[in-house]
Amino acid sequence: MQNTNQLLTSTDANLKQIAPRQLNSSQQDTVKQIKSYVDQAKVAVSKGDVERAYNLASKANMLSADLVRPSR
């Protein structure tokens, strides 16, 4: 559960970091997907489904980390 919370915290920090940026349509869709994963992870945590929560939080974190990386 702690790892899941760390991933969600990291994802939130990544989203705050990219918030001021102008995002293209694809990036905006990715942000929506990230937020959906985060919401689903929180529901899974509340239902005690630790594995599902971790998997969703991990996906959200990976996507948010990709958005934070500078484009080349």
Task: Label every model-predicted segment.
Residues 1-32:
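Amphipathic, heptad-repeat alpha-helical segments
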Residues 25-37, 45, 51, 55-72:
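Short, charge-rich amphipathic alpha-helical segments embedded
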